[in-house]
Amino acid sequence: KEFAAIYRNTIRPLATQQYLEPGDQISRLNTIIFGMEITTIIPYVLYVAKEQSDVGEQNRLFAYLETYLMRRIVTRGTTKNYNNFFRSLIGNQIVTEDALKNYIATRQDASVRMPDDEKVSKSFTAEALSNKQAKGVLFLIESAIRSSRHSTRLLDFDDYSLEHVMPKKWRNNWEGENLSEQEAYERDDLLLTLGNLTLITSALNSAIRDSDWDKKRKGTAGAHGLSMFAQGIETFSLYLERDDWNEEVIKERAEELVGH
């Protein structure tokens, strides 16, 4: 009965359909578990919930666990050894933030190592994540930086869509006729990275999804644009004021995301 109660209070399969309260570290981990489908952490999360009665310490440990997982996601670290790794945390009775930090610091195997700042920073403009991973990263950054006094309420994870600001089919309507073949390939790679992705509150109409920046931003008489569906998104809305969206802006936004 005790374990069943801990499970009910800790593991929340509907977390992606529920409001994420500021500072609710358990719900943030549940977003990673169910929104980004990293279920291998469940046994360890339950172990900590059972063995660590100090809520403050529990939250600090879970916050560091989130940092660890997010860094590995951003850098596209493998998950193949996660089962063994999280079992080893249980076996070594790791139930405090300091113990978790120290244990991770001693792991040098690339399959479980904590990525350093330089690798994380470079990955924001170098790595193409899956849509569910990119959405999860942006959502958790968005939820972390929002003020409780924000004029718009954070939606549930499932209520957001992910949008490539510069579309994959940029050749149709975006400036690029003067790009060399190599520059065009580099653009193709860059537009898949986090700096070119944003959360929006509703998927864009297919009629403007591949439109140029001005039309995609402002919308048309028949279809709303990013100014409607990305307004209020802390990680993006300021860029709606930009006259251009190009490689330089994508890299600038990536640096801003890293800073969060």
Can you name each region flagged by the protein language model?
Residues 85-91, 203-207, 243-248:
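Noncatalytic linker/hinge segments flanking ATPase motor cores
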Residues 1-137:
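A cross-family structural signal marking well-folded subdomains
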Residues 46, 62, 66, 163-166, ...:
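Generic hydrophobic alpha-helical scaffold/packing signal
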